[in-house]
Regions:
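The feature captures the beta-strand-to-loop junction immediately N-terminal to the Walker
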Residues: 33-35
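ABC ATPase C-loop
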Residues: 149-150
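Conserved ABC ATPase signature
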Residues: 132-136
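Conserved catalytic motifs of ABC-family nucleotide-binding domains
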Residues: 153
Length: 235
């Protein structure tokens, strides 16, 4: 499991995360709700090895995730799908996907197997495999970004704001794809502002405010919480 204990992150004198505690059990989808600036992306950067913490620990299956290099965390089974997708728009869909397998570049046969698996998970991409990634719709580009992360063969997928900028119908399709990824055996930590969509597929969740965990609970508990309903569900 993922276990984060008293994790704090500073940017100079500014503290972005304050003693964050959270867990993701094997096979779970856990949502991290929070507004812009709440600290969600900072947490993900820290878990993926892009940012060093000021204090605290984070482990996946007992192996430390902090203090190393990002490629080490990918090799340990933790992959980040970043906010904004960050595709190479002039490269084909398939070339973008193959870049996600860089950490396994010596295993050509395994890369081909994984490519087939992600096409099974995202069948809409099969007919677009030779098209420039930048020519796809926003929803299709998000699916390419998720699929590229899966090419690293993660056991834990960190998804940062996958619904950003997408129309409601497309959000529904993307979250259905995330559910399929989870059903294939991948644990998911999902950072989102779209609480309705995220809690629709999550097992549990946390609310991050000002870099602190202010609330946590099951899907049902968070959907029924007046603070969540007011701040994130608009009811």
């Amino acid at each position: 499991m993922l276990e984060v204990q008293r994790l704090s992150v500073n940017y100079g004198p500014f503290r972005a995360l304050h003693d964050v505690d959270l867990t993701v059990q094997e096979g779970e989808i856990v949502v991290l709700l929070g507004a812009n600036g709440a600290g969600k992306s900072t947490l993900f950067r820290t878990l993926s090895g892009l940012q060093r913490p000021s204090a605290g620990t984070a482990t996946w299956r007992g192996v430390p995730l902090t203090g190393g290099r990002p490629e080490f965390n990918v090799a340990r089974g933790v992959a980040l799908c970043p906010e904004g997708r960050l595709l190479f728009p002039d490269l084909s869909v398939e070339k973008n996907l193959r870049l996600g397998a860089f950490v396994h570049r010596r295993d050509a046969a395994g890369t081909e197997r994984e490519l087939g698996r992600v096409y099974d998970l995202f069948p809409d991409l099969v007919g677009k495999r030779h098209a420039p990634a930048g020519s796809l719709s926003g929803g299709q580009q998000q699916m390419v970004a998720i699929a590229r992360s899966l090419m690293a063969r993660p056991q834990l997928l960190l998804l940062d704001e996958p619904s950003l900028g997408l129309a409601p119908l497309v959000v529904e399709q993307v979250f259905a794809a995330i559910s399929r990824v989870n059903a294939s055996g991948v644990s998911v930590l999902l950072a989102e502002q779209n609480a309705f969509a995220a809690l629709g597929i999550a097992h549990r969740g946390y609310v991050l405010e000002g870099g602190r965990v202010s609330l946590q609970g099951s899907q049902e508990a968070l959907l029924g919480d007046d603070r969540v309903r007011s701040a994130y569900l608009g009811v």
